[in-house]
């Protein structure tokens, strides 16, 4: 009997101890600092432990005012060559998944003549391809051959969710080809009134090689070119420039002969643009008569670092001529550079605002992003009244 009473007493004490520990843990959890959510509205999330990272965000506004966003995945466990499409019917506050598009990668959304298009490559280092949706992204055509959107070209091609431009009666998009260890700039264009799914309607420019001797030998490569329209002149391509070190620059490449040839003068066509060593989007605003972009500019306070991997600051800039750029606002910033990034902003004008989708590395309940590059979120961000007070809201931080 004595042993039974002792066991009973021990069980009661043990239960009381467990209850006390649970209450103590609950109290600690209640007072622990909550994990902050990334800025803006979350479209998609993939914890770092999945080894599936989210990239290549693109954004379009449908004729009825709804927003459509797309993105793809990368990383060791990521599904290959697949784009996910989401839609918002409430101006970006909430998002619903429309589905996945197989055999599509590094793609841009754009609207033309009431239809929604998705244009990129059919796989990483693949062939240019384009699809059309007549129901706002719920379903898509399939690029099976040259008459249905497979824009077959010899070689391997890279790109990103870069702007598709409508200008001079044509649709324009930039790509880069992988040739002899070089990324060569090129432009594809087609007449506005032709079937964009028919490869015969697309003109391809001559491929423009780069030269490692540029920028005193600091030039590495260029990529992710933006097609940009110019008033009273032919379109240009503004490319991201990767360098060994030094100030971040973009390359301004002119189109000639209705998109058949490209020209670039390294002595004058490298442009100082903070953040241009990472992917960016440039668009012209007829109201302000300025070109606008959102980049990962790097503050001076970061010191001497690899600028290409510093993505924790997002800055709004504009230019009257694509050559002289002014920083207006720091839109987002996090003090940590290694595991936080607001990057690959693709955006559209929406009245007095800019709306954007971002590839974001940020904190989550699973321990946060693996690195600033290996992003675990796709988010939506609204920049309100972007044209207002552009002269008085310059960042107080100097930019490299």
Labelled PLM ranges:
Residues 2-17:
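Bacterial N-terminal signal peptides that target proteins for export
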Residues 14-27:
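Bacterial N-terminal signal peptides
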Residues 33-56, 60-106, 110-160, 165-224, ...:
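Beta-rich carbohydrate-recognition and catalytic domains
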Residues 278-279:
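Alpha-helical scaffolding within the catalytic cores
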């Amino acid at each position: 009997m004595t042993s039974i009473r002792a066991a009973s007493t021990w069980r009661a004490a043990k239960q009381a101890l467990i209850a006390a520990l649970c209450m103590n843990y609950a109290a600690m959890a209640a007072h622990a600092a909550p994990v902050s959510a990334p800025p803006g509205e979350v479209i998609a999330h993939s914890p770092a432990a999945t080894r599936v990272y989210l990239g290549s965000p693109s954004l379009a506004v449908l004729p009825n005012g709804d927003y459509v966003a797309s993105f793809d995945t990368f990383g060791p466990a990521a599904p290959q060559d697949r784009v996910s499409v989401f839609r918002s019917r409430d101006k970006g506050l909430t998002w619903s998944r429309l589905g996945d598009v197989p055999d599509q990668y590094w793609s841009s959304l754009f609207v033309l003549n009431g239809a929604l298009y998705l244009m990129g490559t059919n796989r990483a280092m693949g062939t240019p391809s384009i699809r059309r949706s007549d129901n706002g992204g719920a379903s898509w055509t399939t690029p099976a051959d040259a008459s249905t959107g497979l824009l077959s070209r010899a070689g391997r091609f890279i790109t990103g969710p870069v702007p598709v431009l409508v200008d001079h009666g044509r649709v324009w998009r930039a790509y880069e080809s992988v040739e002899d260890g070089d990324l060569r700039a090129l432009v594809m264009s087609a007449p506005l009134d032709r079937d964009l799914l028919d490869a015969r309607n697309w003109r391809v420019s001559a491929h423009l090689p780069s030269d490692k001797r540029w920028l005193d030998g600091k030039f590495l490569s260029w990529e992710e070119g933006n097609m940009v329209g110019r008033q009273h002149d032919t379109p240009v391509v503004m490319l991201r420039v990767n360098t060994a070190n030094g100030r971040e620059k973009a390359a301004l490449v002119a189109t000639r002969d209705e998109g058949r040839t490209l020209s670039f003068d390294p002595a004058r066509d490298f442009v100082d643009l903070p953040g241009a060593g990472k992917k960016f989007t440039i668009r012209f605003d007829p109201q302000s008569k300025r070109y606008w972009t959102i980049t990962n500019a790097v503050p001076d306070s970061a010191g001497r670092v690899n600028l290409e991997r510093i993505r924790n600051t997002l800055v709004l800039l504009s230019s009257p001529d694509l050559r002289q750029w002014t920083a207006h606002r720091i839109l987002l910033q996090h003090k940590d550079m290694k595991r936080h990034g607001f990057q690959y902003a693709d955006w559209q004008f929406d009245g007095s605002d800019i709306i954007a989708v971002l590839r974001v590395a940020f904190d989550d309940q699973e321990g946060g992003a693996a690195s600033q590059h290996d992003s675990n979120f796709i988010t939506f961000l609204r920049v309100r009244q972007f044209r207002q007070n552009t002269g008085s809201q310059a960042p107080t931080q100097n930019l490299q």
